Each structure stands twice: as C-alpha cells, then as structure tokens.
C-alpha cells in the first residue's frame, strides 16, 4: 500500500451539495456511506492515520454535504451524509437523498462504495436499502462492519452471518470486520479499496 500511496498526505479538499461543486478531474473516488454515528469519521481518520481530519461528532447527522478528501493526489474519499437520523426534517432528508443519489448514480470518478454497518447490531432498514440501491446500480461495494472491538471475538462468526443474511449479501463483495480502536481490518480495508481503483 505505502509504495503506491502516502496515506498521511491527506487533506479535506471541498464540500459539495451538487454536481457543479464536484472536483473537475479524473482522480478515482471511493465513497463512504453509512448510518449516522456508524463510525464513518473514525474509519476515515484510522485509514489515514490522522486524529481529526474527518471531524467526529456526538451529534449524528452533522455531515450535510459531500466532503471530498484528497489522498496523496492519487485518490479521493467522498464522505456521504449519514442516513437514518430521525431528528432531521423529512424535507432535509429528501434533499440529502437526492444529493447522494445524484452523486452515486452519475459520478464517473466513483470506483466503489464503502458501505459501513455497525457490527454490534443487525443492519437497519436504511442499511438494507443502501445495499440494495448499490447492487441495483451495479456499484462495487466494500462492506465494513465497524465497532468490532465492542463485540466479543467468540460472537464474530454469528454476527457476520446475521448481517450477511439480513442484507442478502453478495459473496463477491468484500466483507471487512473493522475497529478504529484496535485497528482490526485496517490493512484489509486498504487492500479492498486499492483493488477497486
């Protein structure tokens, strides 16, 4: 990984709410999607070896735009607003939905979506909907189950099976068990991302 990419050379590039704001070049992009508070910011920070590049928040639903991160001028991460947060108005949610859909279905730079689910729980209906959406549009998916440090190792197989069953998981997709606390799944995540470029 390090031969190709200096992952520490990363910065937030811009925030976009529609197509006209997207970067106008052909760098490959990996989008990151998941429920509010699934640990998306922690995932980004862990992958990039940074503490606060992606701001973590105790207030879910904080990211309201597409945040583009430049990684070593070779790749971009695109942080998609967290879904499934009840305290946001229906109108606001519909607006986010449209923005996310527009990006995911029409962005030529997009190579894959890292879809994050909470390893402690079965996927929510929003998680299932997101996975179905990505499969419908034939967008490559890397499924990352976060917060693995909070699940006893003896229950990992059972929990992985439950998540896969609920999602009707495609065995061709990568399934990665991840923890930003002990960095479980860090190298596997990078391998899957670089493979999709």
From Swiss-Prot:
Chloroplast as a keyword of this entry, yes or no, is no
What cofactors does this protein use? Mg(2+)
Domain EngB-type G as annotated: residue spans: 26-197
InterPro entries (alphabetical)? G_ENGB_dom, GTP-bd, GTP-bd_ribosome_bio_YsxC, P-loop_NTPase, Small_GTP-bd
Where does this protein hold GTP?
34-41, 61-65, 79-82, 146-149, 178-180
Q: Which GO terms describe its cellular component?
A: cytosol
Query: Short name of one Pfam family for this protein?
Result: MMR_HSR1
Q: Does the keyword Ribosomal protein apply?
A: no
NCBIfam families listed in its UniProt record: GTPase_YsxC, small_GTP
What family, per the record?
Answer: Belongs to the TRAFAC class TrmE-Era-EngA-EngB-Septin-like GTPase superfamily. EngB GTPase family.
Give the protein's biological function.
Necessary for normal cell division and for the maintenance of normal septation.
User: What protein does this entry describe?
Assistant: Probable GTP-binding protein EngB
Species of origin reads Streptococcus mutans serotype c (strain ATCC 700610 / UA159)
Q: What is the lineage of its organism?
A: Bacteria, Bacillati, Bacillota, Bacilli, Lactobacillales
Q: Gene behind this chain?
A: engB
């Amino acid at each position: 990984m390090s031969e190709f990419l200096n992952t520490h050379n990363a910065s937030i590039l811009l925030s976009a709410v529609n197509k006209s704001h997207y970067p106008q070049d052909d760098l490959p992009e990996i989008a990151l999607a998941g429920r509010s508070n699934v640990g998306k910011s922690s995932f980004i920070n862990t992958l990039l070896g940074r503490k606060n590049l992606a701001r973590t928040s105790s207030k879910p639903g904080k990211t309201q735009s597409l945040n583009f991160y430049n990684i070593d001028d070779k790749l971009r991460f695109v942080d998609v607003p967290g879904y499934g947060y009840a305290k946001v108005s229906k109108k606001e949610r519909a607006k986010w939905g449209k923005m996310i859909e527009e990006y995911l279905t029409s962005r030529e730079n997009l190579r894959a979506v890292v879809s994050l689910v909470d390893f402690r729980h079965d996927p929510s209906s929003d998680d299932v909907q997101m996975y179905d959406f990505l499969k419908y549009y034939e967008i490559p998916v890397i499924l990352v189950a976060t917060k693995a440090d909070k699940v006893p190792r003896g229950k990992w197989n059972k929990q992985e099976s439950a998540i896969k069953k609920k999602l009707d998981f495609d065995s061709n997709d990568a399934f990665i068990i991840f923890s930003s606390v002990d960095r479980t799944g860090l190298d596997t995540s990078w391998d899957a991302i670089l493979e999709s470029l």
